[in-house]
Swiss-Prot record:
The chain crosses the membrane at residues 39-59. The gene is RHS17. Belongs to the glycosyltransferase GT106 family. GO terms for biological process: fucose metabolic process. Coiled coil: none annotated. GO terms for cellular component: membrane. Keywords: Carbohydrate metabolism, Fucose metabolism, Glycoprotein, Glycosyltransferase, Membrane, Signal-anchor, Transferase, Transmembrane, Transmembrane helix. This is Protein ROOT HAIR SPECIFIC 17. PANTHER family: O-FUCOSYLTRANSFERASE 16, PROTEIN ROOT HAIR SPECIFIC 17.
Length: 551
């Protein structure tokens, strides 16, 4: 009974409290009216009213919600300024592999209609080739030289590498590539020799016929322009040989291109060994890693005609370098960037990768030469991906010494690491990017990220006007079709070296599983340049062994 009375008394306390509050407010208002002519009492009255109002709200308002975890839930603010998340990402399986790759396999075998060397050999025709450009540009020349020799029914002399261009690398073919493998592996396709016979050398010592064929020269172009001279002189040299063969050839010639590129052209044992050492050291750091081919060297930026905010110093330095190319016209940097033809900056590449879902914890291998701006240019990328590595950070000076003074050999090491990475990304569409894109398609459609620079330009430019969620959503949408998935490119689209459609066949999943039994997937095995088939299982040089592999 006593408790019941107490409860009633408590219930009646609330109305009494309200009456007291109202009476207090009324009293203060009366004081205000009586003393309105005095400033100090006015301030006191207003202050008193405010205090009483605040007190009344605090006593009458309901109590705050209590959460089970004793923390107040905070809803994300959609107007939050652009801020890259400190941690996290969706480093899931989709980022590291193609879900459709099992439906395709490499198929570069010659068919029964392909004429082998023994049935079409001409012993009095010798083709000399002088390649041009950097290592991967020269690689395209080597590949097409074999096909040109086949078209002309000529004996190919091992191509000479470019030792006079910007890079000034004195390496010969045999210093970078396994020349004996190159000759023997293609013996059924084209006859290749290391040097001209002595009698031919003496004949051309004073009168070597050298010529340059047009770019994208077709088979009929070679037969019309080169064959008559070759028949007459017996020896012809084709100079500046890069992209001098048509992109559109018949299927047999395209398959020959693939046999050269993906099977016959492989690096020397010393380069392969060092390249594999770099890969192994990356694998010790993480199960998966991304390789970035960063073309941000001064010559690349000068050639592009783009501007990166370095003021008058940048304009003078790159402008002077650009004048070395006599055929280049004055560039409109903003127009070039708007059209997606500017190499992405290290920061932009980092933002794109984070937007795609690669977390801050991902290990990143950077394949690059001298970066314009040095460490200051790389700092934003390093902030986005602190686990950043190069061949210099992964090795000692002693280990790298045999390669350090040769730009082509250093580029070959980067090529191997990029080729064997789980995901490959590039900031431009240069020769190495194209060669690797095609190779990774041929060897199993491994994740290969090519920036959709024309679309990305707008979101990079306006990123501070959007949230991170909006930014990453747009990055993923714009990069659809630029991730190395099968069927992203139609047959014949782009350079053949980046889209070897004639050498990639579709198969059923059942056939894939059946043939996959014969593939050794142990990463610790010794692999050749052909892909995932251990060297020990390929002692024979017959082409038929290679197309039975599903990559």
């Amino acid at each position: 009974m006593a408790s019941l009375k107490l409860k009633k008394r408590d219930n009646g306390a609330e109305p009494d409290k309200k009456k007291l509050v109202i009476a207090g407010i009324r009293h203060q208002l009366l004081l205000l009216l009586r003393r309105r002519h005095r400033l100090f009492p006015l301030v006191s009255a207003v202050s008193g009213c405010l205090l009483l109002i605040l007190f009344s709200f605090s006593t009458l308002s309901p109590p705050p919600l209590i959460h089970h975890n004793n923390q107040v839930a905070v809803e994300p603010n959609p107007t939050t300024p652009f801020r890259v998340p400190e941690n996290g990402g969706r480093s899931d399986r989709q980022l590291w592999s193609s879900r459709l790759s099992n439906l395709y396999y490499a198929c570069s075998n010659a068919t029964d209609t392909f004429q082998v060397t023994d049935t079409r050999s001409q012993t009095n025709r010798y083709l000399l080739i002088a390649t041009s450009g950097g290592l991967n540009q020269q690689r395209t020349g080597i590949i097409d030289a074999v096909v040109a020799a086949y078209i002309l029914n000529a004996t190919l002399v091992v191509p000479k590498l470019d030792q006079k261009s910007y890079w000034k690398d004195t390496s010969n073919f045999e210093d970078i590539f396994d020349v004996d493998w190159f000759i023997s592996h293609l013996s059924k396709d084209v006859k290749i020799i290391k040097e001209l016979p002595k009698e031919e050398q003496s004949r051309i010592s004073t009168s070597l016929q050298s010529m340059r064929v047009p770019r994208k020269c077709t088979p009929s172009c070679y037969l019309q322009r080169v064959l008559p001279i070759l028949t007459k002189k017996h020896v012809v040299q084709l100079s500046k040989f890069d992209y001098r063969l048509s992109n559109a050839l018949d299927t047999e010639l395209q398959k020959l291109r693939c046999r050269v590129n993906y099977h016959a052209v492989r690096y020397t044992e010393s380069i392969n060994r060092m390249g594999q050492l770099l890969v192994d050291r990356m694998r010790k750091k993480a199960k998966h890693f991304v390789a970035l081919h960063l073309r941000f060297e001064p010559d690349m930026l000068a050639f592009s005609g783009c501007y990166y905010g370095g003021g008058q110093k940048e304009r003078l330095e790159l402008g002077a370098m650009r004048r070395r190319w006599k055929t280049l016209h004055a560039a409109n940097p903003e127009k070039v960037r708007r059209h997606g033809r500017c190499p992405l900056t290290p920061e932009e590449i980092g933002l794109m990768l984070r937007g795609l879902g690669f977390g801050k914890e991902v290990h990143l291998y950077v394949a690059s030469g001298e970066v314009y701006g040095g460490e200051d240019t790389l700092a934003p990328l390093r902030a986005l991906f602190p686990n950043l590595h190069t061949k210099e950070t992964l090795t000692s000076k002693k280990e790298l010494a045999p390669f350090a003074n040769f730009s082509s050999r250093m580029a070959a090491l980067d090529f191997i690491v990029c080729d064997k990475s789980d995901a490959f990304v590039t900031n431009n569409n240069g020769n190495m990017a194209r060669i690797l894109a095609g190779r990774r398609r041929y060897l199993g459609h491994k994740v290969t990220i090519r920036p959709n620079a024309k679309k990305l330009y707008e979101i990079f430019k306006n990123r501070h006007n959007m949230t991170w969620g909006e930014f990453s959503s747009k990055v993923r949408r714009y990069q659809t079709g630029f991730m190395g998935e099968p069927d992203e490119m139609k047959p014949g689209e782009g350079e053949f070296h980046e889209n070897p459609a004639s050498c990639i066949c579709r198969t059923s999943e059942a056939r894939v599983k059946e043939k996959a039994k014969h593939v050794n997937e142990d990463d610790s095995s010794e692999y050749s340049e052909i892909g995932n088939v251990p060297i020990s299982s390929r002692s024979d040089l017959d082409h038929s062994q290679f197309d039975e592999v599903i990559f």
